[in-house]
Amino acid sequence: YKKNIDQLLENTEKQPEEKHRVVVRTNNEIQIIPVNDLYYIEAYDDYIKLFTKDNYYLKKKTMAYYEQMLDSSVFFRTHRSFIINLQQLTKIEPLEKNNYVALLKNGKKIPLSRSGYVKLKEKLGI
């Protein structure tokens, strides 16, 4: 049974719609999350955490995988450990000397690397 679920998950992720949804397993359920529902993604050891408005999901994938899979006009890698949904971005705040954070609609502050800050300003036309 578990093998069948794993196969289903793998096949679902390879379908052309993969840029529009993320498939995760929670306990014995399979959940399909529209990528527009993602607020941000955070690296977590050998996993990543996919954060939505009300929850987060663990997935054994890499940041590079999601950076390639997701639409680069909507998702942006702010730091080696974070990818944000630009539609959830409300502002960029200074933190301390040459450090900034991206503030999301849910109030979460996501760190910006120095290069991430420069690239984000370029992307936003600032």
Regions found by a protein language model. Name each.
Residues 115-126:
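Short, basic/aromatic-enriched C-terminal tail that caps enzymatic domains
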Residues 1-111:
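Conserved binding/recognition cores within well-folded domains
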